[in-house]
C-alpha cells in the first residue's frame, strides 16, 4: 500500500504519524514536507474533498497568524487563499492512501486508512 503524508518534522503529532506509517508492514511512504513543497490549491481541495473536510476544518486555528489574518470567522475561499500564501496555516499531518484521506490528529487516526 502506498501512503503520502504532508508532514512537518517540527510537529510531534506529524512525527508520530510518520512513525506509525514507517512501522506498518507493506506501507510505502512518500513524505512531503508541505512547508517546503506546499500543495496546490487544487490538490488541497482534492484532499479535503476525499477527507470530507472543508478548508475551515483544515485550518490550523491555533497558529497565531490565523487570528491575525481574521481567519477564525472567514469563509472557505478566504481561508484557502491564506493557506496558499502561508502554508503554516494548513493543519497537519494529512495522510492519503487508497482507502482515503485523514487529518491524523490524534496520530492513531492514520490506522483508519491503512
Give each language-model segment a name.
Residues 34-114:
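Thiol/selenol-based redox catalytic cores and closely related redox-interacting motifs
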